Amino acid sequence: MLKLLLLLALSPLASLVHAAPCPVKQRVGIVGGREASESKWPWQVSLRFKFSFWMHFCGGSLIHPQWVLTAAHCVGLHIKSPELFRVQLREQYLYYADQLLTVNRTVVHPHYYTVEDGADIALLELEIPVNVSTHIHPISLPPASETFPSGTSCWVTGWGDIDSDEPLLPPYPLKQVKVPIVENSLCDRKYHTGLYTGDDVPIVQDGMLCAGNTRSDSCQGDSGGPLVCKVKGTWLQAGVVSWGEGCAEANRPGIYTRVTYYLDWIHRYVPQRS
């Protein structure tokens, strides 16, 4: 069985054993990356859970002035109370300029059970729509026809570990790294390397997307954050950080929830922007 590097596979309560205010270990830190420019990634958000303070536990993305997209394993199957969560919009350094927003409701995909089973996707509705500006505005969702072919250069962002067991240090800057898309069938073969499961048992499913290599990858630290790609001059969200084995390890690309696979479900709740 794959050793998943997730502490939030079932519930954000698992994160609360960590000392504050260090970023909590989930999937997605940035390996091989650098600090992001303050003018970039205006859709990036930090999700917070109430502990002794509002602790960062996952990333997310603003996809509409009133909606945030994240991973289902961040929200959990059993925590239904939106008052336990807060959202911090684009922030260069965690905790240094917090203006936390309240959440009206959480919506977890009904088919989610574990990250390996897929459907690792969730929505948070904000109580009040945000004021869109050059510093804060939503990321565009891709058309259903967009495939993000193998080799496409995309970007993943977050506040997580910078390598296996190497946490991001204060002042906790937002990090970014460029990662190549890995075609699903190739990614699946890579994940079968060294395992005894039969090749006919898929690990990487249609609703998943792979990206990364031994030089650049997501790591522990910010599950739920966005994987974005620039297509014909427009930034599109290709994936949601979900899971993986290790950080930038051979034959183990990062695995993301494929946004196009869940567009119909997203738009049951989130109005389409013109």
Swiss-Prot record:
It is found in: Secreted. One of its GO terms (biological process) is proteolysis. Glycans are attached at residues 104, 131. It is an enzyme of class 3 (hydrolase). GO terms for cellular component: extracellular space. InterPro entries: Peptidase_S1_PA, Peptidase_S1_PA_chymotrypsin, Peptidase_S1A, Trypsin_dom, TRYPSIN_HIS, TRYPSIN_SER. The modification Phosphotyrosine is found at residue 96. SMART domains: Tryp_SPc (SM00020). Its EC number is 3.4.21.59. PROSITE patterns: TRYPSIN_DOM (PS50240), TRYPSIN_HIS (PS00134), TRYPSIN_SER (PS00135). Residues 30-271 form the Peptidase S1 domain. Residues 20-29 form a propeptide. Keywords: Disulfide bond, Glycoprotein, Hydrolase, Phosphoprotein, Protease, Secreted, Serine protease, Signal, Zymogen. GO terms for molecular function: heparin binding; peptidase activity; serine-type endopeptidase activity. The active site is at residues 73, 120, 223. Its main location: secreted. It catalyses: Preferential cleavage: Arg-|-Xaa, Lys-|-Xaa, but with more restricted specificity than trypsin. Tryptase is the major neutral protease present in mast cells and is secreted upon the coupled activation-degranulation response of this cell type. Plays a role in innate immunity. This is Tryptase beta-2. It comes from Rattus norvegicus (Rat).
